[in-house]
């Protein structure tokens, strides 16, 4: 074999090797670009920061303490944090979750906190299972505090058309008095509140539900005051 043939063969082998390396690099880069993107984390929502300053003292006489039981949520998936919507114009019987939106806590807990804030503006609010709730009030004729029980039946972003929607909250409230002979019903009422949503998405539904919850809390506090008289 001549020197010329040896050189030609070496050149051909080198070119083939370089071409193979280049092809491998292209395949690696192509494979990397085809990797699935990292999943998007759902956005967490709540009702906002709550009161930002101490509420001025109410000049009216404080109301009797109230025992607030943990809220039940028979109308919602148990323990779920999904932001739910309902298409009343298409399939009103189906609750659907927004895929990229979650509540920071189950809705019943968020609404319970809002109720406690509103009720606490004029009275002490106790936990129904707390020992303090079993203490008799001398100022109230040594009676036990009234007990407020609540059931969240609906908490969804309700669409009546593709462009019209509202945050809807439906809550059943029951006030009972604890007596030596058992519980005595003082009153029961179903509250239904809707607040229009400014946008047809999760953010619009969340804002509408927060506004509806605040309105419901105010209406419920006024009703409980009437029932307790």
Question: What does each model-identified segment do?
Answer:
Residues 3-22:
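Bacterial N-terminal signal peptides that target proteins for export
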Residues 23-27:
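Hydrophobic helical h-region of N-terminal Sec-dependent signal peptides
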Residues 29-31:
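C-terminal motif of bacterial Sec signal peptides marking the signal peptidase cleavage site
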Residues 33-109, 227-229:
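A structural "domain/chain start" motif
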Residues 34-53, 122-180:
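Surface-exposed short loop/turn segments
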Residues 65-72, 86, 147-151, 168-174, ...:
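Soluble periplasmic/extracytoplasmic beta-strand elements of cell-envelope proteins
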Residues 93-101, 180-222:
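Short secondary-structure boundary motifs at beta->alpha junctions and helix caps
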Residues 116, 120-124, 157, 221-228:
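Sec-exported extracytoplasmic/periplasmic mature domains
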């Amino acid at each position: 074999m001549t020197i010329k043939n040896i050189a030609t063969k070496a050149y051909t082998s080198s070119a083939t090797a370089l071409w193979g390396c280049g092809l491998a690099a292209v395949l690696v880069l192509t494979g990397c670009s085809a990797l699935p993107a990292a999943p998007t984390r759902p956005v967490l929502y709540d009702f906002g920061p709550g009161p930002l300053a101490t509420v001025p003292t109410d000049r009216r006489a404080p109301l009797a303490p109230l025992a607030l039981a943990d809220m039940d949520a028979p109308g919602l998936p148990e323990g779920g944090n999904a932001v739910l919507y309902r298409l009343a114009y298409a399939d009103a019987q189906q609750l659907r979750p927004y895929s990229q939106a979650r509540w920071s806590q189950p809705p019943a807990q968020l609404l319970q906190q809002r109720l406690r804030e509103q009720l606490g503006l004029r009275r002490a609010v106790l936990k129904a299972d707390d020992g303090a709730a079993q203490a008799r009030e001398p100022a109230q004729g040594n009676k036990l505090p009234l007990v407020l029980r609540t059931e969240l039946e609906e908490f969804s972003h309700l669409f009546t058309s593709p462009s019209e929607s509202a945050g809807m909250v439906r809550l059943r409230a029951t006030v009972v008095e604890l007596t030596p002979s058992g519980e005595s019903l003082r009153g029961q009422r179903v509250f239904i509140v809707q607040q229009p949503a400014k946008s047809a998405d999760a953010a619009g539904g969340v804002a509408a539900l927060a506004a509806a919850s605040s309105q419901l809390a105010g209406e419920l506090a006024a009703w409980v005051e009437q029932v307790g008289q």
